[in-house]
């Protein structure tokens, strides 16, 4: 029994939950809902850590952005050490450098975790408007970056208000997209959906890991990452089809 426990412990997947949250001036209208929505997401990830502790190790990164600055509120923090977001942490202003926020965040994350053997990255982008202020990255470079990371098993969800979120997501090669109503309730509802989708994915991942522990031939890293991507897409589709 001890051997099996040790084997399972060695197979834990390090899961990086990355949330890139627009902090431009127009988010003021839904500021409280955005803070509440993130905190609900954080609670969900903490529950996942408790429920799937044998197979998963969760970390949280929260990036907020406007044209004044991109702020790493949390950077790969173990979920148990992540604190709730406060209104003081999130004060909307200025414009929307979406591409720069994505580019800098994803590139840095990739450099820091690319050598981890068993890793899953779940990225959610939340914005209420179109890109309008980036200086370093453009649509083409973000599209190429997302495509590269997707091949490595990263999964992305784009949630947008006041726009065609599906069209914007497709322009960046992001498969999973949701429109949300530009209101407090619409923001909370969309973020709850994202939390439910994550929990579905974590459950599927845990089941797969438990089954894989008894396989004679372990998956290669490439096979495993491809499988993680498919599981995440299936979890998104299931939530959308409810």
Residue positions per predicted region:
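Acidic, low-complexity intrinsically disordered regions
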Residues: 1-242
């Amino acid at each position: 029994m001890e051997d099996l426990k040790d084997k399972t412990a060695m197979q834990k997947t390090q899961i990086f939950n990355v949330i890139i949250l627009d902090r431009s001036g127009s988010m003021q209208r839904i500021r409280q809902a955005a803070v509440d929505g993130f905190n609900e997401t954080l609670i969900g990830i903490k529950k996942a850590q408790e429920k799937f502790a044998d197979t998963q190790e969760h970390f949280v990164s929260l990036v907020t952005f406007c044209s004044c600055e991109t702020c790493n509120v949390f950077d790969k923090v173990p979920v148990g050490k992540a604190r709730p977001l406060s209104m003081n942490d999130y004060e909307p202003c200025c414009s929307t450098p979406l591409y720069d926020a994505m580019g800098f965040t994803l590139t840095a994350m990739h450099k820091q975790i690319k050598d981890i053997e068993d890793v899953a990255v779940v990225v959610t982008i939340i914005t209420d408007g179109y890109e309008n202020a980036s200086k370093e990255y453009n649509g083409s470079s973000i599209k190429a970056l997302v495509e590269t990371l997707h091949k490595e098993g990263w999964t992305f969800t784009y949630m947008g208000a006041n726009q065609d979120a599906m069209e914007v997501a497709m322009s960046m090669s992001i498969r999973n997209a949701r429109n949300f109503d530009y209101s407090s309730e619409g923001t909370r509802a969309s973020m709850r959906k994202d939390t439910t989708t994550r929990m579905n994915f974590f459950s599927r991942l845990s089941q797969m890991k438990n089954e894989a522990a008894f396989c004679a031939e372990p998956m290669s890293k490439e096979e495993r990452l491809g499988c993680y991507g498919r599981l995440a897409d299936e979890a998104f589709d299931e939530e959308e089809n409810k």
